Every structure is written in C-alpha cells, then in structure tokens.
Amino acid sequence: MPIYDEASVPGTAAGRSTTDVGATAGANPFNIPADEEIFRFREEERARKEQDKLIAQTMRVADKTTFAAQMQATATADARTLLRELRPPKGPKATTTLAASSVGTLDRRKEKENMADFIAKKREIFLLQMSLDTKRAEIKKLEERARQREEALKKSEQMLEEDALRFDAFLKENDEKVQEAIKKAEAEAKAKQDKVLEIKRLNTATAALRSELNKYEEQLEDCRRYKEFLDSITPPEWFEQQAAKLQRRKDALVAEWQSQCEALKQRREAALAAKTAAESDYANARTQQQAERAERAIKESVAALKEIMKEKEPQPPNLDFEMDPEDEEMYFQEPGQLLAVYKQLEESNLFYIQNAQETEEALEELRQKLRDTKTRMDAEAQGLQGQVSTLQASIVAAREKAKRLKDRTLENEGAFTLSMGSSNAPTSSVTGSSGPGGPVNLKELGDKVREVYVRCGFDADASISTLQMLTNIEMKLEEYLNLAEGMTPDYVDGAEKAREKDRRKVARDEKLSTQHREHEARMARALERAAAPVFKKTGKPLMFRSAPPQRKKVVQADDRNDEEAELEAYLAQDMI
C-alpha cells in the first residue's frame, strides 16, 4: 500500500487551512481533486503565507503569538469543524455530507475517541480508498491497453489480408505484363529482323547506285578531258565570238532593266505632275463646281501616285553568270573538221619530232663541249688556287709588317702625348681610350663601326673607310629623325606599344625558358640525388680544434696620379 504525506494530500487536517475546511465541509473527503485544484490550493496556501508574513511584520509585539499557540488554535478550529459535521441536520431535507452518511451510527453508544485517532482512521480510510481507486484506474488502463492491442491485431490481420490480396493482384498483373513483354519482344525481334533485311536490301541498292555513280563520274571525267582537248584545238576566235555573244546578252539585260526603271520614273513623274496640276486647279478655282472637280482630280492623282509608289523598282540583273551548257554551241559540227585538225596536228607533231631530234643532237654536242670546258677550267682553277695561296701568304706577311708599324706608330704617339702632359690628346680619336691607361685597338673600333653600319641596313663593303661609314650612319640617323618628326603621335605611341609588347613577350618567353631549364636542372639533380647511394658516416666525427693563423694583408695607398701611372705603364711596355 502506498504511503502519502499528510501535508501533500488536500482534504486532510494537516494540508488544509481553517478557512478551507469551512468552505469544503460538504465535499466528499474520499474524492481526489483535480490537478488544477491541487495547484490552485498550493497557490492559495502560498498567498496566504505571504499575507500572514506581511501582517506579522506590521503587528505589534504584544499582538504576536508563538508557533505552538498558532498550531493549538488551528487544531481547535479543526476539531470544531469536525463536530459540526458530525451533528445531525436540523432541517427535514437530507444532505450528502459525511454527517448524513453516518446517521445510523448516532444511535449507537458513543465512546470517547481521541481526535488524533479519529484523524488517523480517516487518513487510513482515505489512503485505502485512494489505493483502490489507483488499482481500479490501473485495471482500467490495462483493459484499455488490451482492447487497443486487440484492435491493433484485428487491423494487422485485416492489413495482412489486404496485402495478400494486393500481392495476388500484383502477381497476376506481373504475369500479364510478362506475357505482354514476351509478345512485345517477339514483335520487336521480328521488326528487327525485317529492319536488318531492309538494311541489307538498301545496302545492296546503295552499292549498285555507287557503282553506277562511279561509272557516270568516269564518263564525266572522260567528257571533261575530251572537252579540254576540243577547247585546246578550238581557234581562239571562236571563244572571242562566244564571249561577245555573252556580253551582248548581258547588255540586253542591262538595257531592259534601264528601260523598266525609266518607265517607272516617267510614270511617277506623270502622276506627280497630275497631282501638282490638280492642286493648282483647286487653288485657282472660282466656283464651287470647279473646286469639286479639282478636289476629285486631287484624290484620283493621289491614289494613282500611291499605287505607283507602291510598285517596287525592278531588281538589277545578275550579270555574274556564264553561258548555259545547253545553249553553248560547239565549234566542231562535222567529223571532217576534226579530221582536218588531226591531220594538221600530225604534221606539226612530225615537225616537232624532227626539231626535237635535231635539238637532242645539238644538246649532246653542247654536253661534250661542257665536259671539255669543265676539264680545262678545273686545270686553270688549280693553277689559280696555287696563286691564291701564294697571294694569301704575301698578304699575311704584309699584315704582320703593317701591325708592327702600327704598334710603333702608337708608341710614338703615346710618347708625344706624355710629353704634352695631357691625358686626353687629339690622337685619342685614332688610338681610342676605354679607360685610364687602356688603349683601344683600331681594328676592334673599325669592326664595331662596320657592325653598326651593317645593322643600319647598308651593304657590307670592304672598300669603304670607317669615316665614310660613320658619315653614312649619321645621314641615316638624320633621315630617321626627320621621318620621326613627321609621324603622328598616335602612330608613334602605337609603334612604341607594339615594340614594348614584343619586348615583353620576348622577355616572358626567355623567363619561361629559363624557368623550364631550371626546373629540368632541379629534376635532374633530384634524380641524381635519388639514384645516388646513401652516404653513411662511419667512425668518430671530426671535432673543431683551432683555426689556423691568418696573415693580415696591408694595402698600401697609391698616391700617384693618372699621368705617373700612365708613364710607368708606357715605360714598362717599352722595356718589354
């Protein structure tokens, strides 16, 4: 049996207040109130306690009581309430209270009973009644659950029966579909076989047509060759006559088109003149009848002008056509013409054959002369080659001699320059100076000038001197500068952008090629490292002991000037 707390059960002495007992005296204590009533009782109890607390805070000390006195007063109030309930009703009507239910027990001998025992018995009765109600509710729930289970089982059985019926229907439908699919597959197979036979028949027909087409193409090619042959032997005057005939036809088409355009133009001008005349008559009309006639004439002329304006101008003739092959006439109308041409060609061919034989004999004689001349020229070339070798040796010796003389001249000019005390002498244009004490070779300077001369667009000529090349380069530069001054800024900007674009493209290509080469080099090094054997150190590693002594180099400052350094260099060269 479950045990409940008296304070948590509404309707008991410990869980009710004095005012609640008086208000619910006629209610059945064995009925469990609803949940909202329990919560309402709790809220009322909480509000009552808050109110009592506020009242206690405002009361005087003399009016306040202890907790024991409050409990005694509550117990006395509850006992009085129970006594009022146990008294019999005074009126003739019976009530549904607990006192009315215990009327039969009032005639028995009353024994004195303690209030606590009475409340305990009431509590036990209430708890028993609550336990019975709980069990009845559980039994009712179990019965309801069993009923729901039975209904669910019935529904499941019904669903299983329906599923079985549907499955049977599905099997039947599936069998029908299988039969239909088999019939359809047989029909498709038959149709496929028919299509295959049709394809074979069409392939056979296509092959026959293709062979016939090839035969016609061969015939057409033969006809084209015959036509080309006939055109080749046809006199040119015939083609000129055909071209003149075609031109006359084109001229006739152009003349017809021009006449149509002229007729349309005349009709428009006539309609416009009629409209102008009608307007003039309407403006000069003096009577109503004349005005009406002029107005009708204006309407008619306007309508006629609209009709004429709606007419489209004739399209110009298409002159881009050739003679129709069906209308084109052939020069050869009789076989005798071809026989005459063949005879003439045969005679000319015999003449050409005779000329070819004579030409071949002359060619053989020329070949023999060529062989003899070649043998003689080879012998002469060998002799000239020996002379060339001798001349080259002489040229080399002369160049060496000229070089020695040039070096001696440079030494003399250097001595003269030092005696004058000037580092930038006028002879520097001849000797050149790439820096302090560094003479430039005249040959290198001439080669540089010649390279610039060739890059400027001139032809390389060994007979031109360096000064002439420089003069030509200067003239070329002046010409280009004059051309650049005459150019528009837009053209110059466009050319600069194009050159800059080309330069960037070349730089980009070079960069990509460099990156590609570096990538290939890295890949090669990686492959070498991967293929190289693993180096394993053996033994004890070397330890750093002490660094070897280092000697400090003292740099002596050179206080000499450029002239002294050049003099020493010249003297050293002279001594050498």
From Swiss-Prot:
Origin: domain of life: Eukaryota
UniProt region (Disordered), positions on chain: 1-29, 417-439, 495-519, 538-563
Stored InterPro entries: CFAP_domain-containing, DUF4200
Pfam families, alphabetized: DUF4200
Gene Ontology MF terms in the entry: dynein complex binding
GO terms classed as biological process: cell motility; cilium movement; inner dynein arm assembly
Mutant phenotype after disruption: The mia1-1, mia1-2, mia1-3 and mia1-4 mutants do not express the protein in the axoneme and display slightly jerky, slow swimming phenotypes, reduced flagellar beat frequencies and defective phototaxis.
Cellular component per GO, a single term: axonemal doublet microtubule
Coiled-coil residue spans: 125-226, 254-311, 342-408
Family listed: Belongs to the CFAP100 family.
Function of the molecule: As part of MIA, a complex associated with the outer doublet microtubules of the axoneme, may play a role in ciliary/flagellar motility by regulating the assembly and the activity of axonemal inner dynein arm.
Subunit organization: Interacts with FAP73; form the modifier of inner arm (MIA) complex.
Protein name from the UniProt record: Cilia- and flagella-associated protein 100
Source organism of the structure: Chlamydomonas reinhardtii (Chlamydomonas smithii)
Lineage: Eukaryota, Viridiplantae, Chlorophyta, core chlorophytes, Chlorophyceae
